[in-house]
Amino acid sequence: MRPVDLLIVGAGELVTMAGGPRRGERMKDAAVIPGGALAARDGRIVAVGPEDEVLRTVETGPDTRVIDARGRAVIPGFVDPHTHLCFAGDRAEEFALRLGGATYQEIAARGGGILETVRATRAASQAELVELGLARLDQLALNGTTTVEVKSGYGLSLADELKQLRAIRAMARRHPLTVVPTFMGAHEVPPEYRSRREAYVDLLVEEMLPAVAAEPGLARFADVFTEAGVFSVAESRRILERAKALGFGVKVHADELSDLGGAALAAELGAISAEHLLHASDEALAKLAEAGTVAVCLPGTSFCLMNAPYARARRMIELGCTVALGSDYNPGSCPAYAMPFIITLACMHLGLNPSEALAAATINAAAAIGMEAEVGSLEVGKLADVVILSTPTHWHIPYHMGMGVVAKVVKRGRLIVDEGKVRRR
C-alpha cells in the first residue's frame, strides 16, 4: 500500500489520454477508463485505473484529500500552447472597427493592431504587467487550463521585451499554473524601425536574443511572425537560426494571412511547432508531419476576425500531422482564453470530434511546448494536473458550448479551483 495525499474517486469516466501525442486515427482514442480513479503524492500521479484496483494499492491518511467526482468526467488539465496574455490596455475600439467591416490588415496599416498594444505595454510598469497577468491566469485556471505558454512581443525594444519576459517570470513564480515563456521580439517591426527593417532584424539577432539567453529562466522558445508585411521567410530564418544557436526551441507564426512559406520554414528548421496555418499548402503540411513539427490550430482567432478562414485540421490529420489546439489569447485578434470554448470551435469549424479536440487541447498541446513527458495526460509519474468536469462525459464540453463545464481543477495535486474560486496558495 502506497500513502497518497490526493485521491479522486467516483468518476463517471476517467479520460487519461495515455500513450503519448496522437496522430491520425489515434486522436479518436481518449484512453477512457469507465469508473476510474486517480491517486497522487507530492504533486505527481502514483496510481490510475479502475477504482477498485486503485483503492487496493493506495493508503489514505488524515491529510489525504479525497475528492468524489460524483459520476462526472475527470480529464487532464488543459494545456494552452499559444497565448499573448502579458499585455496592457485593450483593443475594444478595434473590435468595433471589425464589426464595421475593417480587416486585420487595414487596422494594422492605420497604426492599430499589435502596435496599439505595444504602446500600452511600453507605458506599463513591470509590476502592473504582473498584476494584469496574474488576474488573467486566474481566468485560465477557472476554465481548466493548468499549463500555458506565454509570449512576449508587445515590447519590441530590448528594454521592453526584457520587462515583459521578467513580468512573465514573476507571474509564474506567484501563480500555481505552469507558465512556459516564449520570446517573440519578432512579433512586428516597431514604428521607430519601419524605415530600416534590416536594423531591427540586426537588433533581434545581435542584441535581443543574446540578452534573453543570458538571463536564466526568461524564455524557453523563440517565435517569429512570418507573414507578408511583417517578417519575410529569409528574415525569419536568420532570426530563428540565431535562436537555435543560442539554445532556444523555435516556433513560427506561419501562413496565417497568406501562403508565404512559414510552415515549410518551420519544418526545415525542425521547429517544435508551427501555429495558425490558415493558408498552409498540402505540401507544407506534409513537411510538418515529416519533421514532427506540431501543427497548432487557433480557431478562436478565425472566429474573432470573422472574415478569416479556419485552419484545415481535418486535412492536417489526414497528412499525418500532430494537431494541437491553442487559444491565441491576445487583446486584439482573440480576446478569448477558455479552452472549452476553443474545443467547441474546433468541433464546429475544424471538423474534429470531441475526443480529437480534447487530445489536441491536452497531450498534443503539451507536445507543442515540449511538455508531453510532464503534462497533458493522466499517467503514473506525471504531474497531477486534473480537471473534474460538471458533466458526465468529455463529449459534453462542446455540447455545452464550453460554458460552465469546469467544476474543480487540481494542479500538482492541489485543489486550486473549487466552486468558482481560485486558490493561488
Swiss-Prot record:
Gene3D superfamilies: Metal-dependent hydrolases, Urease, subunit C, domain 1. N-formimidoyl-L-glutamate binds at residues 154, 330, 332. 4-imidazolone-5-propanoate binds at residues 91, 154, 187, 256, 333. Transmembrane segments: none annotated. GO terms for cellular component: cytoplasm. Its cofactor is Zn(2+); Fe(3+). Fe(3+) binds at residues 82, 84, 253, 328. InterPro entries: Amidohydro-rel, HutI, Metal-dep_hydrolase_composite, Metal_Hydrolase. One of its GO terms (biological process) is L-histidine catabolic process to glutamate and formamide. It comes from the Bacteria. Zn(2+) binds at residues 82, 84, 253, 328. The keyword Metal-binding applies. It is found in: Cytoplasm. GO terms for molecular function: imidazolonepropionase activity; iron ion binding; zinc ion binding. Binds 1 zinc or iron ion per subunit. It catalyses: 4-imidazolone-5-propanoate + H2O = N-formimidoyl-L-glutamate. It holds the Pfam family Amidohydro_1. Keywords: Cytoplasm, Histidine metabolism, Hydrolase, Iron, Metal-binding, Zinc. HAMAP family: HutI. Catalyzes the hydrolytic cleavage of the carbon-nitrogen bond in imidazolone-5-propanoate to yield N-formimidoyl-L-glutamate. It is the third step in the universal histidine degradation pathway. Belongs to the metallo-dependent hydrolases superfamily. HutI family. This is Imidazolonepropionase. It comes from Symbiobacterium thermophilum (strain DSM 24528 / JCM 14929 / IAM 14863 / T). The gene is hutI.
